C-alpha cells in the first residue's frame, strides 16, 4: 500500500515538474492510479469498521488465558496481476524520469547553441549565451617607412654597415582567440610580415599558438608557442608600445629565450596587483638551423603594483633568464653550442637587418640575464626605466672569467589630449590610451595624441681595449650603442595608430678582423620613420 502511495506521489511530482513530458498515453495510467486509490480507501474504511466491531464484542467476553502465539505468517504475495501492474508502473516512472532528463539536456544545449555575435572596436566575436564558448578574430597590421641619414662614411665601411632606407610590413598578423568549456582557452596567431629581418613578406609563421587552462584562477597553465614575459618593456604588446620598437636592452633579453613563436610551458599567477610567471622554453618554432638538441632555458618574472588608484599606478618588475643549455650546432656528441646577442638600432626598416653591436661565442656553457624595471603613471603622464645585466660562460674555458655586459633605458609619455594609458592585468604592462572622442572632422573629434621619448644605452664590450691596440686576452668587442628617440603617436580611434619618430644613433666599436682590426668602426646617424598600424 505504501508502495502505491509512493508511486503515485512520484508520478505526480514528475508530472508537475515536466508536464510536457507526459504524452496522451500517460493519462490512462493516471486514471488507473486514481481508481486503485479509491479502492484502497474503501478497503481501509471497511477494515476500520470490522476492527471497531471486534473491539465491542471482545469487551463482553472473559479474558482468554495467555497462550503461546505462533510466529505470524509471512505476508501474502501480491497477486500476479497486481505485481505485473506495479512493475509496469515502475518502468513508466523510470521512462518518464529519463525522458525528463533528456529534455533538460536538450534545453541546456539549445541555450548553449544560441550564440551571440558582436563587434567591439573592430574585433568580431562569437560567444555562447552561457559564456563557456567563444571565438574572436585578432589582427595586427604594421606598415613601416623609414629613412637612414648616414652619409658617405657608412658606405665606406665593411659590408653590412650601410642601412637600407625603404619600407616593409613589420607585422601582418591574423589569428583566432577564444575559449571552450569555460576553463580552457586557446590562441592561434600567424604572422605574414617581415619581422624586421628581410623587409619582404613571408609565407607565414607561428607568432603564437597555445592552449591554456584557466580553471584554477588566479593560476594559469599555458603550453605551446608564445613569448614568455622577460620583463616590463617586453610585456607591452607589439601594438601598445610607446615607440615603434622596444628598447635595445629589453630586446636583447627578449631574444635570449623569449620572443615570438618560442616553444614554452608556462605557469602564471595573474592578480589585480601581483603578477608572476615561470616558463621552461626551447627554440623558436621557425628556427631550423640546429641539427640536434635545441636550446633549453628558464624564464621568470614577478611584478607588483604597490600603489593603485584613480590617478596613480606604480609597478615594479624583476625578471631573470637562464639559458642553461644552449642549442647544438650539429648532430655530433661533441657539438659546439654557439650563442649570440645582437639588436638593430630600435627601428626595423633595413632589409639586411644590420646590427651595430653584437656578441657571438662559438661554444657556450650557459648564458643568463636579469633586469629590474619600474614604471609610474599619473593621470596622462608615464615614466618608466630599467637596468639589464647579461652574462655568457664559455664552454671548455677554465682560464678566463665569464663575459659580462649591461644596458639601461628611460622613457616616458605625455598624452596631450588628456587620456591615460590603460593597464593589462594579463600582461602586467600598460596599454595604449583610448581616445575620448574618435576622429571625425564633422563632429569636431580628433582622437588622442601622445608625445613619447626614450634614451637607451647598450654596452656589449667586456675588456675591449682601446682603438689602435690589440684585443686583450678574453676581451670582447661587441660595441656600445646609445639611442635618443622622440615620437608622436596619433590614435584616431581604438583600432588605428600612427607613429612618427626621429632618432639619433651613436655607436662605437673597435674592429677585430681584417683591415678594420683595432680601428673604430662605429658611426653616428639620424633616422626618421613612420608607422601606420591597425590592431583589433
What is each PLM-predicted segment?
Residues 116, 256-257, 363-364:
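Short, solvent-exposed secondary-structure boundary motifs
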Residues 119-326, 376, 404-409, 414-444, ...:
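Outer membrane beta-barrel
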Residues 17, 21, 148-149, 394:
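N-terminal low-complexity, intrinsically disordered patches enriched in charged
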Residues 110, 162-164, 362:
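Short, surface-exposed alpha-helical recognition segments that flank or form part
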Residues 22-140, 416, 420-438, 444, ...:
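N-terminal periplasmic/intermembrane-space "pro-region" immediately following the signal or transit peptide
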Residues 1-22:
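Gram-negative bacterial Sec-dependent N-terminal signal peptides
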Residues 212, 314, 320, 330-536:
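Outer-membrane beta-barrel pore domains
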Amino acid at each position: 500500500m505504501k508502495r502505491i502511495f509512493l508511486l503515485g506521489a512520484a508520478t505526480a511530482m514528475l508530472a508537475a515538474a515536466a508536464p510536457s513530458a507526459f504524452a496522451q498515453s500517460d493519462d490512462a495510467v493516471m486514471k488507473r492510479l486514481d481508481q486503485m486509490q479509491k479502492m484502497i480507501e474503501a478497503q481501509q474504511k471497511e477494515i476500520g469498521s470490522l476492527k471497531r466491531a471486534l473491539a465491542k464484542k471482545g469487551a463482553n467476553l472473559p479474558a482468554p488465558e495467555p497462550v503461546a502465539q505462533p510466529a505470524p505468517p509471512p505476508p501474502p504475495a501480491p497477486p500476479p496481476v497486481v505485481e505485473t501492474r506495479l512493475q509496469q508502473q515502475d518502468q513508466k516512472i523510470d521512462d518518464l524520469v529519463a525522458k525528463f532528463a533528456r529534455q533538460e539536456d536538450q534545453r541546456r544545449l539549445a541555450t548553449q547553441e544560441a550564440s551571440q555575435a558582436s563587434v567591439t572596436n573592430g574585433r568580431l566575436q562569437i560567444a555562447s549565451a552561457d559564456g563557456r564558448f567563444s571565438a574572436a578574430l585578432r589582427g595586427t597590421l604594421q606598415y613601416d617607412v623609414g629613412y637612414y641619414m648616414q652619409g658617405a662614411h657608412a658606405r665606406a665601411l665593411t659590408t653590412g654597415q650601410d642601412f637600407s632606407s625603404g619600407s616593409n610590413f613589420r607585422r601582418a598578423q591574423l589569428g583566432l582567440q577564444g575559449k571552450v568549456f569555460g576553463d580552457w582557452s586557446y590562441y592561434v596567431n600567424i604572422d605574414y610580415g617581415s619581422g624586421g629581418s628581410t623587409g619582404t613578406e613571408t609565407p607565414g609563421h607561428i607568432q603564437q599558438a597555445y592552449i591554456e587552462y584557466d580553471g584554477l584562477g588566479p593560476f594559469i597553465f599555458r603550453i605551446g608557442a608564445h613569448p614568455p614575459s622577460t620583463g616590463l618593456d617586453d610585456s607591452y604588446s607589439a601594438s601598445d608600445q610607446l615607440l615603434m620598437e622596444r628598447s635595445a636592452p629589453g630586446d636583447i633579453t627578449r631574444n635570449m629565450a623569449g620572443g615570438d613563436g618560442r616553444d614554452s610551458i608556462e605557469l602564471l599567477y595573474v592578480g589585480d596587483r601581483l603578477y608572476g610567471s615561470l616558463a621552461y622554453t626551447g627554440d623558436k618554432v621557425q628556427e631550423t638551423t640546429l641539427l640536434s638538441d635545441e636550446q633549453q632555458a628558464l624564464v621568470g618574472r614577478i611584478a607588483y603594483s604597490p600603489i593603485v588608484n584613480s590617478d596613480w599606478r606604480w609597478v615594479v618588475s624583476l625578471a631573470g633568464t637562464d639559458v642553461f643549455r644552449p642549442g647544438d650546432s650539429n648532430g655530433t656528441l661533441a657539438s659546439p653550442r654557439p650563442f649570440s646577442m645582437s639588436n638593430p638600432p630600435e627601428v626595423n626598416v633595413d632589409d639586411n637587418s644590420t646590427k651595430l653591436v653584437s656578441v657571438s661565442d662559438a661554444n657556450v656553457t650557459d648564458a643568463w640575464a636579469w633586469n629590474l624595471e619600474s614604471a609610474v603613471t599619473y593621470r596622462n603622464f608615464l615614466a618608466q626605466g630599467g637596468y639589464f645585466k647579461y652574462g655568457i660562460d664559455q664552454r671548455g674555458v677554465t682560464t678566463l672569467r665569464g663575459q659580462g655586459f649591461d644596458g639601461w633605458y628611460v622613457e616616458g609619455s605625455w598624452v596631450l589630449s588628456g587620456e591615460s594609458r590603460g593597464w593589462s592585468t594579463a600582461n602586467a604592462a600598460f596599454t595604449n590610451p583610448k581616445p575620448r572622442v574618435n576622429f571625425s572632422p564633422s563632429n569636431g573629434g580628433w582622437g588622442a595624441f601622445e608625445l613619447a621619448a626614450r634614451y637607451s644605452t647598450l654596452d656589449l664590450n667586456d675588456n675591449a681595449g682601446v682603438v689602435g691596440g690589440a684585443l686583450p686576452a678574453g676581451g670582447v668587442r661587441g660595441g656600445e650603442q646609445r639611442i635618443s628617440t622622440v615620437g608622436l603617436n596619433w590614435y584616431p580611434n581604438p583600432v588605428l595608430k600612427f607613429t612618427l619618430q626621429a632618432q639619433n644613433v651613436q655607436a662605437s666599436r673597435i674592429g677585430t678582423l681584417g683591415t678594420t682590426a683595432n680601428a673604430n668602426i662605429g658611426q653616428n646617424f639620424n633616422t626618421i620613420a613612420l608607422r601606420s598600424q591597425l590592431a583589433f
